[in-house]
Amino acid sequence: YFSYNDKIIKILEAEYLNADHHFTSGTVISDKLEIACGSGILRVKKLQQESKKALSIEEFLRGTNILKDTVLK
């Protein structure tokens, strides 16, 4: 999970990509919500905001704009 705009968002489905990067862990590195983590990249596919139904990443991004270079906690 991660926190964004004071809301907890659970990652329900994701894919790990083994890729070198120079970003700080937790940094959003694409407009499709790919997140730098350790020695790879987490590509989020499905998530759920607190008190809301689960959404595909496409559905989520239609209503929420998480900008590239945002660092998630």
UniProtKB/Swiss-Prot annotation:
It catalyses: L-methionyl-tRNA(fMet) + (6R)-10-formyltetrahydrofolate = N-formyl-L-methionyl-tRNA(fMet) + (6S)-5,6,7,8-tetrahydrofolate + H(+). It holds the Pfam family Formyl_trans_C. It comes from the Bacteria. Keywords: Protein biosynthesis, Transferase. The keyword Protein biosynthesis applies. The keyword Magnesium does not apply. Its EC number is 2.1.2.9. Belongs to the Fmt family. Attaches a formyl group to the free amino group of methionyl-tRNA(fMet). The formyl group appears to play a dual role in the initiator identity of N-formylmethionyl-tRNA by promoting its recognition by IF2 and preventing the misappropriation of this tRNA by the elongation apparatus. This is Methionyl-tRNA formyltransferase. The lineage of its organism: Bacteria, Pseudomonadati, Pseudomonadota, Alphaproteobacteria, Rickettsiales.
